[in-house]
Amino acid sequence: MSTNLQIGIVGLPNVGKSTLFNAITKAGAEAANFPFCTIEPNVGVVEVPDHRIYDLAGIFNPKKTTPAFTRFVDIAGLVAGASKGEGLGNQFLSHIRETDAIAHVVRCFDDENITHIEGGINPVRDMGIINTELCLADLESVDKKRVKTAKLAQAGIKEAKAVLPIYERVFQVLQEGIPARTLDLAEDELAVLKELNLITLKPVLYVLNTAEDDIANPIDNPYVQAAAAQAEKENAKWVPVSAEIEQEVSELEEGEAKAFLADLGETEPGLNRLIRTAYAMLGLINFFTVGEDECRAWTVHSGTKAPKAAGKIHSDIERGFIRAEIITYDELIKCGSFAAAREKGLLRVEGKEYIIKDGDIAYFRFNV
């Protein structure tokens, strides 16, 4: 797999979370109208939408084409009290801790046949319930660390004195039910908190699940308006998706799916938007390796230097890195072949300090 990016899908029971997950993976997780139907966290692997890998495969005709992938983890329905072990709380909070980001599915549709665990439809309330549970779970781990660090600070331990204010500050906001990610934490402060693996430090993408009729103009839906305003207050990203449409699309052949979406006035599935938004939110980019054996997309964080990117392929390449030969996707597509690109002098030789750009095609020279 080209990436280990992992996104946890959370949401209250019966908001459309399992329906969305089914569409993502075509895995058919049991989406019954019952609060705790998703007992084990399902993991699904989905291709990152990027036409460039297939364009490159068209030039090289490789034996194998490997796009980038994202892992989605469907985490069972959280409810009020989950942080205290109610519903299916504790084991699921530990699953969320293992993810890079959280996709929080929020119900923005009316349907009297699908019960809501809290009674009526109120997306802002639902967002608050889940955020409160995640804050409470983090509060417990921060408090333990804070108490322990305070004792060490009192005993005159210099390092403890230096980091105690960080734990105090995070503890304060979590007590108020505010996620830690809303704090403007410096790199060194984040490094101190890293070992706690706080859930509320993870970036959140609100997936606003709308009715099929609303997907053309989701912002006209008052539920979407309320949820989007709340997301913006939290400096969080949001994306409107109709889980029902996504499930229908996932069951169609490619041609039929395009026609179905076109009838709805859409050019692509909402899932593509979801994945792209998650990529942008996490600052991720793709670079490529090409050849007759394989054309492959690799995912790294924006700002990654060439040796580190090479390490994605194999640790030996990072260890013995000599240089990278780089050409951009656009240049190679224009030239039509490596030979033509070489003739035009478009292949650049870059050293250890080179920062990989989105769409770079890289050939790494190394010696171990």
Predicted regions and their residues:
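Short Asp/Glu-rich motifs
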Residues: I39, T115, S250
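Conserved Switch II/interswitch segment of TRAFAC-class P-loop GTPases
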Residues: G44-P49, A76-E86, R97-K158, V173-A186, ...
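Amphipathic alpha-helical transducer elements in NTP-driven molecular machines
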Residues: F36, D50-I53, T66-F72, E86-D100, ...
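C-terminal-of-GTPase-core extension/linker across diverse P-loop GTPases
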Residues: M1-V10, V15, F21, K148-I355, ...
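Conserved G1/Walker A P-loop phosphate-binding module
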Residues: M1-E112, D143-K144
